Regions:
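Residue-level detector of conserved, function-critical positions
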Residues: 1-67
């Protein structure tokens, strides 16, 4: 897969941008979380802030929203 941008690796994952949207990859460049986010920040304490459909939220490493 080609990425137009890759963020900093943190806790084994990095945010990466595909053609338009962001997802998360591991150090082998394998997709771990789908490329569906408008914004994606690095993980910190197993939580990352993402933007989806104009909404800011926090997700865990499984992609589930955290409150």
């Amino acid at each position: 897969k080609r990425f137009s941008a890759i963020g900093h690796f943190s806790e084994g994952l990095a945010p990466a941008r595909g053609k338009i949207q962001w997802g998360y990859i591991d150090k082998e460049n394998q997709e771990i979380l789908p490329f569906k986010y408008d914004i994606a920040e690095p993980f910190y304490n197993n939580i990352a802030r993402v933007g989806l459909y104009g909404k800011s939220m926090k997700i865990n490493k499984q992609g589930s929203e955290c409150l």
